[in-house]
Amino acid sequence: MDINEILQYLPHRYPFLLVDRVLEIEEGKRILALKNVTMNEPFFPGHFPHHPVMPGVLIVEAMAQAAALLSFKSMGVKPDENSVVYFAGIDNVRFKRPVVPGDQLLFDVVITQSKRNIYKYKGVARVDGELATEAELTCALKTLS
Protein backbone atom coordinates (compact mmCIF):
# COMPACT_ATOMS: atom_id res chain seq x y z
CA MET A 1 0.00 0.00 0.00
CA ASP A 2 1.61 3.26 -1.08
CA ILE A 3 1.08 6.72 0.39
CA ASN A 4 -1.83 7.50 -1.96
CA GLU A 5 -3.80 4.52 -0.66
CA ILE A 6 -2.77 5.25 2.95
CA LEU A 7 -4.28 8.73 2.56
CA GLN A 8 -7.61 7.10 1.71
CA TYR A 9 -7.64 5.22 5.03
CA LEU A 10 -6.13 7.69 7.50
CA PRO A 11 -7.40 11.20 8.23
CA HIS A 12 -3.92 12.33 9.34
CA ARG A 13 -1.96 14.75 7.18
CA TYR A 14 1.39 16.52 7.38
CA PRO A 15 2.93 16.98 9.87
CA PHE A 16 1.08 14.21 11.71
CA LEU A 17 0.89 11.43 9.12
CA LEU A 18 3.52 8.99 10.40
CA VAL A 19 3.17 5.95 8.12
CA ASP A 20 4.91 6.09 4.74
CA ARG A 21 4.19 2.64 3.31
CA VAL A 22 2.50 -0.66 4.11
CA LEU A 23 4.68 -3.62 3.14
CA GLU A 24 2.34 -6.45 4.17
CA ILE A 25 -1.19 -6.74 5.45
CA GLU A 26 -3.13 -9.82 6.52
CA GLU A 27 -6.65 -8.51 6.99
CA GLY A 28 -7.98 -9.26 10.46
CA LYS A 29 -4.53 -10.27 11.68
CA ARG A 30 -1.39 -8.23 11.04
CA ILE A 31 0.23 -5.26 9.33
CA LEU A 32 3.85 -4.49 8.52
CA ALA A 33 4.37 -0.78 7.84
CA LEU A 34 7.26 1.66 7.75
CA LYS A 35 8.20 5.23 8.54
CA ASN A 36 11.30 6.82 7.05
CA VAL A 37 12.73 9.14 9.68
CA THR A 38 14.53 12.14 8.19
CA MET A 39 16.15 15.26 9.59
CA ASN A 40 13.29 17.20 7.97
CA GLU A 41 10.80 16.01 10.62
CA PRO A 42 9.22 19.08 12.27
CA PHE A 43 9.99 17.87 15.81
CA PHE A 44 13.77 17.52 15.47
CA PRO A 45 14.68 21.22 15.86
CA GLY A 46 13.25 21.10 19.38
CA HIS A 47 13.87 17.43 20.34
CA PHE A 48 16.84 17.86 20.69
CA PRO A 49 18.84 20.51 18.78
CA HIS A 50 22.20 19.05 19.84
CA HIS A 51 21.16 15.38 19.51
CA PRO A 52 17.93 14.81 17.49
CA VAL A 53 15.79 11.93 18.81
CA MET A 54 12.27 11.03 17.66
CA PRO A 55 9.86 11.48 20.59
CA GLY A 56 8.70 8.13 21.92
CA VAL A 57 5.07 9.22 21.95
CA LEU A 58 5.28 9.78 18.18
CA ILE A 59 6.68 6.28 17.67
CA VAL A 60 3.67 4.93 19.56
CA GLU A 61 1.35 7.22 17.55
CA ALA A 62 2.83 5.86 14.30
CA MET A 63 2.21 2.34 15.59
CA ALA A 64 -1.41 3.33 16.33
CA GLN A 65 -1.79 4.74 12.81
CA ALA A 66 -0.61 1.39 11.41
CA ALA A 67 -3.17 -0.31 13.68
CA ALA A 68 -5.93 1.97 12.36
CA LEU A 69 -4.97 1.07 8.78
CA LEU A 70 -5.20 -2.61 9.69
CA SER A 71 -8.63 -2.13 11.27
CA PHE A 72 -10.14 -0.20 8.37
CA LYS A 73 -8.74 -2.62 5.78
CA SER A 74 -9.96 -5.58 7.85
CA MET A 75 -13.47 -4.15 8.07
CA GLY A 76 -13.46 -3.39 4.35
CA VAL A 77 -14.41 0.25 4.90
CA LYS A 78 -12.77 3.60 4.45
CA PRO A 79 -13.16 6.31 7.06
CA ASP A 80 -15.43 9.19 6.21
CA GLU A 81 -16.69 12.34 7.88
CA ASN A 82 -18.98 10.16 10.04
CA SER A 83 -16.35 7.82 11.50
CA VAL A 84 -13.09 8.08 13.38
CA VAL A 85 -10.71 5.71 15.16
CA TYR A 86 -9.75 6.97 18.60
CA PHE A 87 -6.60 5.93 20.37
CA ALA A 88 -8.15 4.64 23.62
CA GLY A 89 -5.26 3.16 25.61
CA ILE A 90 -1.61 2.22 25.81
CA ASP A 91 -0.16 -0.47 28.06
CA ASN A 92 3.26 -1.96 28.66
CA VAL A 93 5.15 0.56 26.54
CA ARG A 94 8.90 0.09 26.47
CA PHE A 95 11.46 2.19 24.62
CA LYS A 96 14.56 0.11 23.92
CA ARG A 97 16.67 2.35 21.69
CA PRO A 98 16.54 5.92 20.40
CA VAL A 99 15.26 6.59 16.89
CA VAL A 100 17.31 9.19 15.02
CA PRO A 101 17.39 10.84 11.58
CA GLY A 102 18.26 8.29 8.90
CA ASP A 103 16.51 5.42 10.68
CA GLN A 104 13.73 3.44 9.06
CA LEU A 105 11.10 2.33 11.57
CA LEU A 106 9.41 -0.96 10.76
CA PHE A 107 6.11 -1.49 12.58
CA ASP A 108 4.74 -4.99 13.10
CA VAL A 109 1.25 -4.80 14.61
CA VAL A 110 -1.12 -7.70 15.28
CA ILE A 111 -4.75 -7.65 16.36
CA THR A 112 -5.01 -9.52 19.66
CA GLN A 113 -8.70 -8.92 20.35
CA SER A 114 -11.73 -7.30 18.74
CA LYS A 115 -15.17 -6.83 20.25
CA ARG A 116 -17.77 -4.70 18.54
CA ASN A 117 -15.88 -1.47 17.81
CA ILE A 118 -12.99 -1.96 20.27
CA TYR A 119 -9.68 -3.35 19.00
CA LYS A 120 -6.59 -4.40 20.96
CA TYR A 121 -3.17 -4.78 19.37
CA LYS A 122 0.37 -5.79 20.19
CA GLY A 123 2.94 -3.75 18.31
CA VAL A 124 6.68 -3.56 17.95
CA ALA A 125 8.85 -1.04 16.14
CA ARG A 126 12.29 -2.05 14.91
CA VAL A 127 15.24 -0.29 13.32
CA ASP A 128 17.60 -2.53 11.35
CA GLY A 129 16.08 -5.56 13.09
CA GLU A 130 16.73 -4.11 16.55
CA LEU A 131 13.76 -3.58 18.87
CA ALA A 132 13.13 0.14 19.37
CA THR A 133 9.67 0.22 20.95
CA GLU A 134 6.97 -2.21 22.01
CA ALA A 135 3.44 -1.52 23.22
CA GLU A 136 -0.07 -2.85 23.64
CA LEU A 137 -2.65 -0.53 22.10
CA THR A 138 -6.41 -0.13 22.34
CA CYS A 139 -8.40 1.74 19.70
CA ALA A 140 -12.11 2.42 19.36
CA LEU A 141 -14.05 2.98 16.16
CA LYS A 142 -16.60 5.73 16.74
CA THR A 143 -19.43 6.67 14.44
CA LEU A 144 -20.11 10.38 14.62
CA SER A 145 -23.65 11.70 14.49
From Swiss-Prot:
Protein name: 3-hydroxyacyl-[acyl-carrier-protein] dehydratase FabZ
Lineage, top ranks: Bacteria, Pseudomonadati, Pseudomonadota, Betaproteobacteria, Rhodocyclales
GO cellular component: cytoplasm; membrane
The gene coding this protein: fabZ
Cysteine pairings via disulfide bonds: none
Protein family: Belongs to the thioester dehydratase family. FabZ subfamily.
GO molecular function: (3R)-hydroxyacyl-[acyl-carrier-protein] dehydratase activity
Domain of life per record: Bacteria
SUPFAM superfamilies, sorted: Thioesterase/thiol ester dehydrase-isomerase
Record's catalysed reaction(s): a (3R)-hydroxyacyl-[ACP] = a (2E)-enoyl-[ACP] + H2O
GO biological process: fatty acid biosynthetic process; lipid A biosynthetic process
Compartmental location: Cytoplasm
Entry's EC annotation: 4.2.1.59
Active site, per annotation: H47
NCBIfam families: fabZ, PRK00006.1
This protein's UniProt keywords: Cytoplasm, Lipid A biosynthesis, Lipid biosynthesis, Lipid metabolism, Lyase
CDD domains: FabZ
